[in-house]
Design a protein with these regions (language model features):
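PP2C/PPM-type serine/threonine phosphatase catalytic domain
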Residues: 1-282
Length: 282
């Protein structure tokens, strides 16, 4: 994993300004409220390496975060739980919504270094890591940041769109192919490594993230979905959309329904799966 991760050194931090359709995003919206739902399952794994947190604060902000741990034994579990707890604690220092982008950018570096420095009970390097998706909202504004292959979706007008990218070797291969640095044959020869992560917390030198420096403006009834890869590797976008568009149920019921369907469709192996839903409405 670390060998593949080392390949990302030539990639710099990304601000989402291309490859994402921003045409449907505008500055409309009223001071409505956020409804929350969350669910996490262990799947068929022996242990839970996902960690999540979501809460509303008195200052009007809502914080949502999911980390998907990686590493043998308890390495991934410790990495994800450490990252979530530290982020939640550090977020207490944010007093104004305008501070969020800078906070998130600096926090990712801090979390990366902290997870990289984790040790096991014998003082050996833990060797674990975790992905990160984090969203902060206030009113109809939203900031986010991500590292790894957990996703953030926006559901609007019967459409679903991921607003961040999977930071895996496929992303790098696609870029190299597009720039003429490799041939299609060379691409195919390396495609078996496509899902190896090239960015995650715990690398110790993280430099690839997706984020926004200007607020993403929500419209009434927009839904934000944060999830670990256990969800989208089992359910298609269409299947996810069919479930979350159920306006007759609460976000909590829908979050639980997503994971219930995941397990219903599981025939053999299912990864830990975590989801957080935030609906901006009345």
């Amino acid at each position: 994993m670390r060998e593949e991760a080392a390949r990302q050194n030539e990639v710099t931090t990304v601000r989402l300004t291309e490859e994402i359709n921003w045409e449907s995003i505008d500055r409309k919206g009223n001071a409505l409220h956020i409804e929350i739902g969350q669910s996490s399952i262990i799947g068929t794994r022996s242990y839970q390496q996902d960690a999540l947190f979501v809460a509303k604060y008195e200052n009007g902000m809502t914080l949502a975060v999911i980390c998907d741990g990686m590493g043998g034994l308890n390495g991934g579990e410790l990495a994800s739980n450490t990252a979530v707890k530290m982020l939640v604690n550090d977020f207490k220092s944010v007093n104004d919504f305008s501070e969020v982008p800078i906070f998130l950018e600096r926090e990712v570096v801090r979390l990366d270094e902290c997870v990289a420095d984790l040790e096991d009970e014998y003082g050996n390097a833990l060797g674990g890591g975790c992905t990160l998706v984090c969203v902060v909202t206030k009113g109809n504004g939203m900031y986010f940041i991500s590292a790894g292959d957990s996703r953030i979706y926006i559901v609007r007008d019967n459409d679903i769109q991921a607003i961040n990218r999977d930071h895996n070797f496929r992303l790098q291969l696609d870029t190299m192919l597009r720039n003429g640095q490799i041939t299609e044959k060379e691409y195919e020869m390396q495609e078996n490594q496509a899902e190896a992560l090239i960015s995650y917390l715990g690398m110790g030198n993280i430099s690839l993230t997706d984020s926004n420096t200007e607020p993403f403006y929500l419209e009434e009834n927009d839904l934000i979905l944060l999830c670990s890869d256990g969800l989208y590797k089992r359910l298609s976008n269409e299947q996810i959309l069919d479930i979350v568009l159920d306006n007759q149920n609460s976000m909590q019921v829908i979050a639980e329904r997503l994971n219930k369907v995941v397990m219903q469709l599981t025939q053999r192996n299912q990864d830990n799966t975590s989801v957080i839903l935030l609906r901006y409405g009345r």
